[in-house]
Amino acid sequence: MALRLLRLVPPRVGGIHTSVQFKLQYGPLAYILGEKATKKMTEKSKLITVDGNICSGKSKLAKEIAEKLGLKHFPEAGIHYVDSTTGDGKPLPVQFSGNCSLEKFYDDPKSNDGNSYRLQAWLYASRLLQYADALEHLLSTGQGVVLERSIYSDFVFLEAMYRQGFIRKQCVDHYNQVKKVTICEYLPPHVVVYVDVPVPEVQSRIQKKGNPHEMKITSAYLQDIENAYKGTFLPEMSEKCEVLQYSAWEAQDAEKVVEDIEYLKYDKGPWLDQNDRNLHKLRMLVQDKLEVLNYTSIPVFLPEVTVGAHQSDQVFQEFTELPGRKYRAGYNEDVGDKWIWLK
């Protein structure tokens, strides 16, 4: 379903539009003619992720790191990530955005309609698309990027959900299969920055924030997230990239964090083994978002995420009735596309 909808996603702005099929894009010819990623790389061409529990202050820190180092900041990918980066940027109705709800998860995490795992699966796909966008930006411009969480840390929520009995073992197996065939195609971050905030402090911040849905999050769920971070994520990532850990108080000093990042040796991880040929193949993948998403589709029946043929067709038809979604990008008169008959 996600693949079908993404094929019709139009660009943000309508107007006189030359043929989409002939839009200039990076490809083998550009590579042969000298378009090499390594030529654009500098000491600041790094992919940095900032991780931490809910309300840990990672968003503020990630933005400050990006500003101080001159990197591109990617806010955390949510349910409407695709909507925010395509079309007019406005969120689409829930049936076109994974048919899941974060608010419903907080209110009723054990809902028998499968919302909890549907949410987790959709968020992983959203993070995958964002990670591809971040890599594409890095490889095409040489400018480093800073993300809030990533496909490498997404599993901490899955583990917490399973330990709390929110999802079935079959859901965990499905997630791990999807992760296995997707994550192997990408390079890990150069740096992981982890903000360690104790669960009682996290709960205090949630209460202070005042979101009625988030206020229903249990301490046990938050503790399981922290345990997954410290017990699995950080040890695994320390073998692939540089890892920096800070307390809640230390993370407030963004200047010190940036200084630590600049002093890292970057002497481990798969980035050291990359050459222009490898990076060319990676860039070809990440710029093709349909191919990126295609890896998330595996032939396994799971009630939580399986959509029947008739329902799929109905949702697809409803999607094409939205403004600018009936035809390919540049061919929709209802959003201002002109000279369509000449294309």
Curated annotation (Swiss-Prot):
GO cellular component, one term: respiratory chain complex I
CDD domains reported for this sequence: NDUO42
Transit peptide: 1-23
Residue positions, PTM N6-succinyllysine: K110
SUPFAM superfamilies, alphabetized: P-loop containing nucleoside triphosphate hydrolases
UniProt key word Nucleotide-binding: no
Cofactor: how bound: Binds 1 FAD per subunit.
Compartments where found: Mitochondrion matrix
Names of the cofactor(s): FAD
Gene3D superfamilies: P-loop containing nucleotide triphosphate hydrolases
Modified residues (N6-acetyllysine): K110
Modification Phosphoserine occurs at: S238
Keyword line: Acetylation, Electron transport, FAD, Flavoprotein, Mitochondrion, Phosphoprotein, Respiratory chain, Transit peptide, Transport
Entry-linked InterPro entries: Deoxyribonucleoside_kinase (IPR050566), DNK_dom (IPR031314), NDUFA10 (IPR015828), P-loop_NTPase (IPR027417)
GO terms, biological process: mitochondrial electron transport, NADH to ubiquinone
PTM entry text: Phosphorylation at Ser-238 by PINK1 is required for the binding and/or reduction of the complex I substrate ubiquinone.
Pfam entry (one): dNK
Description of how the protein assembles with itself and partners: Complex I is composed of 45 different subunits. This a component of the hydrophobic protein fraction.
Family indicated by similarity: Belongs to the complex I NDUFA10 subunit family.
Role according to the record: Accessory subunit of the mitochondrial membrane respiratory chain NADH dehydrogenase (Complex I), that is believed not to be involved in catalysis. Complex I functions in the transfer of electrons from NADH to the respiratory chain. The immediate electron acceptor for the enzyme is believed to be ubiquinone.
Name recorded for this polypeptide: NADH dehydrogenase [ubiquinone] 1 alpha subcomplex subunit 10, mitochondrial
